[in-house]
């Protein structure tokens, strides 16, 4: 029952199409995306403020900025077309907005993979109240 509660809490705070973004993260890192990256640092999860705490948190900051540039659909709920081909994530479909959201998620998943060595468990479930420094600009 406790595990179910933890997963439910995690589901509330993740931006984007949860399943699709989580699958991309799993594919690129081998980690379960929801539990590994939700509420990590100052930017992973819902919203964000302050300075990214490390390169992993910066991936989330860049992802938030990318979502902020998407026009024509809601990146938080958009369902897009994508596939995995030879270890790569390939965004598809004809809708430019959905492709843009997919690209944001793809780039973030790759960023997590490239920065796995910076992942620090002390930033899991990090309090937003500890994110006091001035925010970087997108």
Swiss-Prot record:
Ordered alphabetically, the record's keywords are:
Disulfide bond, Hydrolase, Lipid degradation, Lipid metabolism, Metal-binding, Secreted, Signal, Toxin
Q: What is its EC number?
A: 3.1.1.4
User: Which GO BP terms apply?
Assistant: arachidonate secretion; lipid catabolic process; negative regulation of T cell proliferation; phospholipid metabolic process
According to the record, cofactor stoichiometry and binding are noted as: Binds 1 Ca(2+) ion.
Q: Which GO terms describe its molecular function?
A: calcium ion binding; calcium-dependent phospholipase A2 activity; phospholipid binding; toxin activity
Where does the UniProt annotation place the signal sequence?
Answer: 1-16
The cofactors it requires, by name, are: Ca(2+)
Question: Per its UniProt record, what InterPro entries does this chain match?
Answer: PLipase_A2, PLipase_A2_Asp_AS, PLipase_A2_dom, PLipase_A2_dom_sf, PLipase_A2_His_AS
Q: What is its main location?
A: secreted
Q: What class of enzyme is it?
A: hydrolase
Taken from the UniProt entry, a GO cellular component term is: extracellular region
Against PROSITE patterns, the record matches this protein to: PA2_ASP, PA2_HIS
Q: In which tissues is it expressed?
A: Expressed by the venom gland.
Disulfide connectivity? 42-131, 44-60, 59-111, 65-138, 66-104, 73-97, 91-102
Question: What are the subcellular locations of this protein?
Answer: Secreted
Described purpose of this protein according to its UniProt entry = Exhibits high hydrolytic activities and shows strong preference for the anionic micelles (dPPC with deoxycholate) to the zwitterionic micelles (dPPC with Triton X-100). PLA2 catalyzes the calcium-dependent hydrolysis of the 2-acyl groups in 3-sn-phosphoglycerides.
Which family is this sequence assigned to? Belongs to the phospholipase A2 family. Group II subfamily. D49 sub-subfamily.
Query: What's the protein name?
Result: Acidic phospholipase A2 DsM-a2/DsM-a2'
């Amino acid at each position: 029952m406790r595990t179910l509660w933890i997963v439910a809490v995690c589901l509330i705070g993740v931006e984007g199409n949860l399943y699709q973004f989580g699958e991309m993260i799993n594919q690129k890192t081998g980690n379960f995306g929801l539990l590994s990256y939700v509420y990590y640092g100052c930017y992973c999860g819902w919203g964000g403020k302050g300075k990214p705490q490390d390169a992993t948190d910066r991936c989330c900051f860049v992802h938030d900025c990318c979502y902020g540039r998407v026009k024509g659909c809601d990146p938080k709920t958009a369902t897009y077309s994508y596939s995995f081909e030879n270890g790569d994530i390939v965004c598809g479909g004809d809708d430019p907005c959905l492709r843009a959201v997919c690209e944001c998620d793809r780039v973030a998943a790759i960023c997590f993979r490239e920065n796995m060595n910076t992942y620090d468990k002390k930033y899991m479930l990090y309090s937003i109240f500890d994110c006091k420094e001035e925010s970087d600009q997108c």
